[in-house]
């Protein structure tokens, strides 16, 4: 059953998973207005919430929806208010 709100487009861009103590390079496999599929080493160690840096776009706060080996499915969230 398809649960996506918006269709994803294959993009194959480089991005960065920004964490409080480090940054991990990733490949953005596909992208929509509401989420993305990412490939990166150490995907199992990425916390459930993080900031994704995509070239030519503002940073986006993400929540992991699924994990499979070196891949993550994320949905975009509002940045938390501090």
Where are the regions a protein language model picked out?
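Structured alpha-helical
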Residues: 1-82
């Amino acid at each position: 059953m398809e649960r996506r709100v918006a269709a994803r487009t294959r993009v194959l861009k480089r991005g960065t998973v920004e964490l409080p103590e480090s940054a991990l390079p990733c490949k953005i496999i596909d992208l929509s207005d509401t989420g993305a599929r990412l490939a990166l080493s150490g995907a199992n160690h990425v916390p459930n919430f993080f900031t994704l840096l995509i070239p030519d776009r503002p940073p986006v706060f993400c929540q992991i929806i699924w994990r499979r080996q070196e891949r993550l499915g994320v949905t975009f969230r509002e940045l938390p208010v501090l």
